[in-house]
């Protein structure tokens, strides 16, 4: 059924009926490859067939066998497995296999091999394969460095040569060449006549080795027993079975001392050696210590002999000498000495030395936890056991005794074995703690990065808020600047308006002053007023060419319809207001001139006779009355239906601001509506001249209707122009003639003026 033992072992190792790997069969496969019973090429071909099995368990076990031969069979298998074709086969196998556990195992193997041969250019194909698989998106498991450790020793490759490597005899047809399995060199038949197993290469059966390698391999066992007896020439004549047996390896000479004596001597030498080494190490430290600590160190008890070896097996932790462990735990005692020296040097004043110091009361600087104390005790105990074991082995080697017969060595070995398992548990626990602390450190790093990112975001947010605040402040300043500009413009307009009002007020005051000066000048020129002249018939004075007519033409330039006269009716005041400008008594005011009746219009002056029945109303006036008193022209009687308006002294006109109601001058009465009783001027008698009622004219009736319908609003003519005209008229007027016709009556439509306001 099976062609060879390799096929049988491979079938057992890759059977799908197994629940766990068959490690004995796997190790036998490795031994067969190392012993050259199977070539690496054939072995790898058989394993590839098992890898392509449809059963996932068989495929997984075949990968486990492949991993074992790669780790244990050395360079020949490496050169066979890590070729370019086989690496491409691994990639295709990963793509084609439907089983997840097989795929993960293959990825783990590729990663382990790539890491193990990362520094070797000879196996570049497996590293390229891993790179390609990563590029394709395959996820590799976590790498464990322990899986990538290839520490197994492999047999060297066979060298080739034409002569023997030892005796230099040339190989011929009859003198065949042979290779030593231990060193790999080529030898003749006589130089490779011996055989022995090679456990370090995984070769359990006896194989051909050269004489030099055989002597080197047999020297540790034969040299320990025959170191003092010397080499025996008869050993070569003994059979190989006897030489390989345990009897030949034992000491053949009788022991000079008993086992108990040797044990006691060995323990004594061990204690002396430990004491000497401890003293040598503590000597430089004791020189630096203060005298008190040195004396306390001298009072420490001396070490005692260790207990019997038989107690090691029963109580492994209590087998060590506590005093010896105290000496071996140097770090603890050094720390105690440092603490003692620091406690002694801390007080400023020297304190007296107590007679009996108690070192056990002095606590170390750092208080250790219970787990740390337990681990320290275990480490000290194991260190002591290892040193005792090493010293025992050295003692046996120096005395030439067999180790197999020493029960103390065996007991120490069993004790160290039990301590080793406990040490592994402690190591695992420490590794777990280390990983936990590393995770904490990673989390702290993440927290630190997160805090840095948060601080950066906070800074950006603060910067953003600052920019927003600056933008708002800039907009607020712009708005304030615009408002300030608008307010400045309004202020300038208001100041300009106030300036105009002030200038206008000053102009009005100047006009008033000029008007007053002109009035005073006119009054001064006119002199005192004369009594009114009597009524003159129209026939007594010629109509045209008389001096009075010329005087009227010169002196009355405001009469309507006459050349040189201004239009009738009140003119608007130059200041834009409709208030009445008062004229002092005795001054002719053309603004209140009434329309002349038909008998007094130009061309018909003094043509109508006096009304009969009232001759006494107008006494006769001398003809030269106008010549002596030119102001008498202004005192002519008006119509009988309209009383002469009183002369109101001039008052300054108040300035009116646009948008406000016109203010009335205090003390000024409103003008009297026609039909009321006229007011008389103080100091002057009203004169009534009987005048015939003129025929009503349509134009006058229309004017009177408008005046009755509208409220009376007295308007003053331009004061400056009136004053200038009056001054020119008075200056250029000739002497009045003797026969002066009657003056033109004032307009009858003039409403009644307000009461006279005195300046007193």
UniProtKB/Swiss-Prot annotation:
One Gene Ontology cellular component annotation held by this UniProt entry: cell cortex
Binding site for Zn(2+) 2: 180, 183, 210, 213
Region (Disordered): 275-323, 338-359, 602-626, 644-760
Ranges of Low complexity composition bias in the record: 653-694, 706-733
Domain VHS: 13-141
A single GO molecular function term of this UniProt record: zinc ion binding
UniProt xrefs under SMART domains: FYVE, VHS
Chain sites annotated for binding Zn(2+) 1: 164, 167, 188, 191
Biased composition (Basic and acidic residues): 307-316
Coiled coil (UniProt feature): none
Domain UIM: 263-282
Keywords: Cytoplasm, Developmental protein, Metal-binding, Phosphoprotein, Zinc, Zinc-finger
One Pfam family in the UniProt entry: FYVE
Compositionally skewed regions (Pro residues) per UniProt: 349-358, 609-622, 734-744
GO biological process: early endosome to late endosome transport; endocytic recycling; endocytosis; endosomal transport; endosome transport via multivesicular body sorting pathway; exosomal secretion; negative regulation of smoothened signaling pathway; negative regulation of torso signaling pathway
Location of Phosphoserine modifications: 300, 302
Record localization: Cytoplasm, Cell cortex; Cytoplasm, Perinuclear region
Zn finger (FYVE-type) location: 158-218
Gene3D superfamilies, per the entry: 1.20.5.1940, 1.25.40.90, Zinc/RING finger domain, C3HC4 (zinc finger)
Assembly description: Homodimer; in vitro. Interacts with ubiquitin.
PANTHER family (alphabetical): HEPATOCYTE GROWTH FACTOR-REGULATED TYROSINE KINASE SUBSTRATE
Its biological purpose: Essential role in endosome membrane invagination and formation of multivesicular bodies, MVBs. Required during gastrulation and appears to regulate early embryonic signaling pathways. Inhibits tyrosine kinase receptor signaling by promoting degradation of the tyrosine-phosphorylated, active receptor, potentially by sorting activated receptors into MVBs. The MVBs are then trafficked to the lysosome where their contents are degraded.
Protein name stated in the entry: Hepatocyte growth factor-regulated tyrosine kinase substrate
Gene it is expressed from: Hrs
């Amino acid at each position: 059924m099976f062609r060879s033992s390799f096929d049988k072992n491979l079938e057992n190792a890759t059977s799908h009926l197994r629940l766990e790997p068959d490690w004995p069969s796997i190790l036998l496969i490795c031994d067969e490859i190392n012993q050259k019973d199977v070539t690496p090429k054939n072995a790898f071909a058989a394993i590839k067939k098992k890898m392509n099995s449809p059963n996932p368990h068989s495929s997984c076990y075949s990968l486990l066998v492949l991993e074992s031969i790669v780790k244990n069979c050395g360079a020949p298998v490496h050169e066979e497995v890590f070729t370019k074709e086989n690496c491409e086969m691994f990639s295709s196998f990963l793509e084609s296999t439907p089983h997840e556990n097989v795929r993960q195992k293959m990825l783990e193997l590729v990663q382990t091999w790539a890491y193990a041969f990362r520094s070797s250019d000879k196996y570049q194909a497996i590293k390229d394969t891993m790179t390609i698989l990563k590029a394709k998106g395959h996820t590799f498991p976590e790498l464990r460095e322990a899986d990538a450790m290839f520490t197994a020793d492999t047999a060297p490759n066979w060298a080739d040569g034409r002569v023997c490597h030892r005796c230099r005899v040339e190989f011929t047809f009859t003198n065949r060449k042979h290779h030593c399995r231990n060193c790999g060199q080529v030898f003749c038949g006589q130089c490779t006549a011996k055989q022995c197993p090679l456990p370090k290469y995984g070769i359990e059966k006896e194989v051909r080795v050269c004489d030099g390698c055989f002597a080197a391999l047999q020297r540790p066992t034969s040299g320990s027993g025959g170191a003092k007896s010397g080499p025996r020439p008869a050993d070569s004549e003994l059979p190989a079975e006897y030489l390989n047996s345990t009897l030949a390896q034992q000491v053949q000479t009788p022991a000079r001392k008993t086992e108990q004596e040797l044990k006691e001597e060995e323990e004594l030498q061990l204690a002396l050696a430990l004491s000497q080494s401890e003293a040598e190490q503590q000597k430089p430290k004791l020189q630096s210590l203060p005298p008190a600590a040195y004396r306390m160190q001298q009072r420490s008890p001396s070490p005692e002999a260790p207990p019997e070896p038989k107690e090691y097996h029963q109580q492994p932790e209590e087998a060590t000498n506590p005093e010896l462990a105290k000496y071996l735990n140097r770090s603890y005692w050094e720390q105690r000495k440092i603490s003692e020296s620091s406690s002694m040097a801390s007080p400023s004043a020297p304190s007296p030395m107590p007679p009996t110091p108690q070192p056990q009361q002095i606590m170390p600087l750092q208080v250790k936890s219970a787990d740390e104390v337990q681990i320290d005790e275990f480490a000290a105990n194991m260190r002591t056991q290892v040193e005792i074991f090493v010293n025992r082995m050295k003692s046996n080697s120096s005395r030439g005794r067999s180790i197999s017969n020493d029960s103390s060595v065996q007991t120490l070995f069993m004790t160290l074995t039990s301590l080793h398992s406990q040490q592994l548990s402690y190591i695992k626990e420490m590794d777990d703690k280390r990983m936990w602390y590393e995770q904490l450190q990673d989390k702290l790093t993440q927290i630190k990065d997160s805090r840095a990112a948060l601080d950066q975001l906070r800074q950006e947010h603060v910067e953003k808020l600052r920019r927003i605040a600056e933008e708002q402040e800039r907009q607020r300043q712009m708005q304030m600047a615009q408002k300030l500009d608008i307010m400045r413009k309004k202020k300038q307009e208001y100041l300009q308006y106030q300036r105009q009002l002030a200038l206008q007020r000053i102009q009005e005051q100047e006009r008033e002053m000029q008007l007053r000066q002109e009035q005073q000048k006119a009054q001064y020129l006119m002199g005192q007023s004369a009594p009114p002249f009597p009524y003159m018939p129209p026939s007594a004075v010629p109509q045209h060419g008389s001096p009075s007519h010329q005087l009227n033409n010169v002196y009355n330039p405001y009469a309507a319809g006459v050349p040189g006269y201004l239009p009738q009716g009140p003119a608007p005041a130059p200041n834009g207001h409709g208030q009445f400008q008062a004229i002092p008594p005795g001054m002719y005011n053309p603004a209140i001139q009434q329309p002349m009746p038909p008998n007094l219009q130009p061309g018909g002056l003094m043509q109508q006779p006096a009304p009969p029945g009232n001759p006494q109303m107008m006494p006769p006036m001398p003809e030269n009355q106008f010549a002596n008193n030119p102001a008498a022209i202004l005192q002519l009687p008006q119509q009988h239906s309209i009383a002469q308006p009183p002369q109101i002294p001039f008052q300054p006109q108040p300035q009116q601001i646009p948008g406000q109601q016109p203010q009335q001058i205090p003390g000024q009465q409103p003008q009297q509506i026609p039909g009321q009783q006229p007011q008389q001027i103080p100091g002057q008698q009203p004169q009534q001249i009987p005048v015939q009622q003129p025929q009503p004219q349509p134009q006058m009736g229309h004017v009177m209707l408008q005046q009755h319908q509208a409220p009376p609003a007295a308007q003053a003519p331009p004061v400056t122009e009136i004053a200038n005209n009056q001054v020119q008229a008075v200056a250029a007027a000739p002497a009045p003639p003797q026969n002066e016709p009657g003056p033109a009556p004032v307009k009858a439509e003039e409403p009644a003026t307000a009461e006279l306001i005195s300046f007193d």
